From Swiss-Prot:
Disulfide cysteine pairs (residue numbers): none
The enzyme's E.C. designation: 5.3.1.5
Subunit record text: Homotetramer.
Name recorded for this polypeptide: Xylose isomerase
List of residues binding Mg(2+) 2: E267, H270, D306, D308
Family classification: Belongs to the xylose isomerase family.
Requisite cofactors: Mg(2+)
Presence of the UniProt keyword Manganese in the record: no
Cytoplasm as UniProt keyword: yes
Domain of life: Bacteria
Annotated InterPro entries: Xyl_isomerase-like_sf, Xylose_isom_bac, Xylose_isomerase
Binding-site list for Mg(2+) 1: E231, E267, D295, D338
The organism of origin for this protein: Rhizobium leguminosarum bv. trifolii (strain WSM2304)
Amino acid sequence: MSTGFFGDIQKVKYEGPDSTNPLAFRYYQPDEIVMGKRMEDHLRFAVAYWHTFTWPGGDPFGGQTFLRPWFEDTMKAAKLKADVAFEFFSLLGSPYYCFHDADVRPEGKNFAENTKNLNEIVDYFAEKQASTGTKLLWGTANLFSNRRYMSGAATNPDPDVFAFAAATVKTCIDATQKLGGENYVLWGGREGYETLLNTDLKRELDQLGRFLNLVVEYKHKIGYTGTILIEPKPQEPTKHQYDYDVATVYGFLKKHGLENEVKLNIEQGHAILAGHSFEHELALANALGIFGSIDMNRNDYQSGWDTDQFPNNVPEMALAYYHVLAGGGFKTGGTNFDSKLRRQSLDPADLLIGHIGGMDCCARGLKAAARMIEDKALSQPLADRYAGWESAEAQKLFRGEYSLDEITNWVETKDVNPQPRSGKQELLENVVNRYV
């Protein structure tokens, strides 16, 4: 039943590249077969509950611009928000959604009331999922907005805050499991510091390791079969975040023996903040065996902070999905639109239009990536570039069968005098542009 929030807008349909209808897909066709799989099953789109239905439109210089009828901290408002959200998922045809606990339930006076409120809304969500067919990609806990977390959650100097946060995560894992969520995400929003003058760096990292081990232990205890994901971010809101980027998180997981238990949810905007390209973070996560899922958005390249805009750059999407596909595609992860409207985009239709544009952009990127893989447009030049390593002698070198003395003798007796070869970067950049 319609809530009336979206007026007379009908379910978004595919109309083809020539369509000028802003409420239609031009490239995203859920049932189109790409590399032997439905496009919907490749992309596994999800809507972010927080930016789409909870963000009030404020910025550092001004307050709320969005006037939503559910902007009250009551259970009645939470259920109205859920009604609108699931109507939105159905109109858009999004197979998944994601949420923080604080996005979906009113704030209680204590932990017990928060848990009661969360359980009530989870029961409501279960009914909505059953009636719409929309599924939960992942759940998570908001351990950064409330003032109790101003000095961190797992890394807080107060053990009571650590305990409150750990108990909150338990309830959120329970909620995620009950709703059939395929992943559970940990984002260390305030797991970092502003100054070393009041920070015991080693202690905080050890606390974070203990916290993550507790989560993994609980996952196995209750038989939760989803994937635990960490989302890296270099700064914001703290100056120095402990989960800076893929490489940093991998080192942390390795130190605590969790590299086979936890994978990463990689956000495009966070990669940019860390000084990396999106495809760098995806390729590195694949190389390290910890790729899990994507938060899809983009940052303004001039602003220098996290702007969470909808993706609109097809070449960037093509390279991103190239690495997703090259790594075997999503397993339990997907493409979550961690994107928000600009604060002047007030119309309900703008929510749909932003997601439609993002989904079309991703669809174009996916199809370009698939063609590049099928044509070996990048993989063959890569194989040719490293072909020398396929020789018998080079394989022995790679496997560690030669000592430094033996390698030196080989170079001398064979009079090895290598000459550089072109890296062909311009050619490969032109190849990518041919596909997009």
